[in-house]
């Protein structure tokens, strides 16, 4: 089995369905003998360019270990899901379990917001 990093972008109107989508994709991988090493929900972010007249979208990153058949099934699911605007699958050499640089940035932004809210409350 090989290791893969998958990033997919979801339509912002479908953001509330992201946890269900993640569970569906995780169950697809695990039911066929694969493993999910890391799941990161990066949240709603600004797009680099307009996609379908949208400026923002919901980003999700998943690191998995699976076979070719499972990967083909996932790619098929991404292609025919209208809520998924774009997806990228990259083969990696080893399983990534540490937080990605993007997730660290998301955590920093959340910490700044929390600090600003606590200052306003005080």
UniProtKB/Swiss-Prot annotation:
GO terms for biological process: translation. It comes from the Bacteria. Pfam families: Ribosomal_S6. SUPFAM superfamilies: Ribosomal protein S6 (SSF54995). One of its GO terms (cellular component) is cytosolic small ribosomal subunit. The gene is rpsF. Binds together with bS18 to 16S ribosomal RNA. Keywords: Ribonucleoprotein, Ribosomal protein, RNA-binding, rRNA-binding. Residues 95-122 are annotated as: Disordered. This is Small ribosomal subunit protein bS6. HAMAP family: Ribosomal_bS6 (MF_00360). InterPro entries: Ribosomal_bS6 (IPR000529), Ribosomal_bS6_sf (IPR035980), Ribosomal_S6_plastid/chlpt (IPR020814), Transl_elong_EF1B/ribsomal_bS6 (IPR014717). Disulfide bonds: none annotated.
